[in-house]
Amino acid sequence: YFVPCRNGWADDYSTHTRGSFSFADAEEGGIINNTYPNTRTDFSQAIASCPVPIISHETGQFQIYPDYAQIDKYTGVLAPWNLEEFRRRLREAGMESQAEDFARASGEWAVRLYRADIEMDLRTRGFGGFQLLDLQDYPGQGSAYVGILDAFMDSKGLITPERWREFCSQTVPLFICDRVCWIADNNIYGDIRIANYSPLDLAGRKVAWRLSRQDKGRTIATGTITIEPQPKKQG
């Protein structure tokens, strides 16, 4: 297998095998940051020329503003001087009272971005998989606060394990469409797919779906589909 963040070089995103980069490494930070939001884009073009499975390297890396309450957890030989310095600068700027808001807002945004990036992997047929930079924060080497968990493997309260597994699990239902925002008179068109990395054959199984309003919980439409057998790869 091959573990890159891109398979070769190009002037566009056609060789990318993850959805985001630094602005120094890709035009405007990559697919997620610089293309119209949708759930159809995948990495099929990037993996087409590779004869072995591709595993996306360090998917994510979405920065989350740190929660300074974790400073008290450092009771061993590692001192959180970086966190203390960040808090000092925020205090000098007169914004220390907003620290929790910054942590919560950036964390909620990071969860959405992780979902977008991971689902891009899952809807790429024939993809070998992905690896995150880390599920937890890494406070060394320049402070990589990119984790859904803090450096002590404790939850930041951003998402429950159950919600995380809705898009990061061995079997994930996916809705494929060209946009993620609609107005009242738009028709919604899309495809339903199942990303299945489990050992189970799901062909013939029934999948129930429901479209509802999140604010009122009112059901708009329901239905069922039958999972079709996947065509076998030739050659």
Where are the regions that the model predicts?
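Generic beta-strand/beta-sheet core signal
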Residues: H57, L133-Q136, F167, A195, ...
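Beta-strand-rich binding/interaction modules
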Residues: N186-E228
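Aromatic sugar-binding surface patches on proteins
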Residues: K232-G235
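Substrate-binding/catalytic cleft of secreted carbohydrate-active enzymes
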Residues: Y1-D150
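Active-site-proximal structural scaffolding
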Residues: Y114, R123, G157, D185, ...
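Short, solvent-exposed loop/linker segments at the N-terminal edge
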Residues: V180-N186
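Outer-membrane beta-barrel proteins
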Residues: S106, D178-V180, Y197
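Proline/serine/threonine-rich low-complexity linkers at boundaries of modular beta-sandwich domains
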Residues: M153, L158-P173
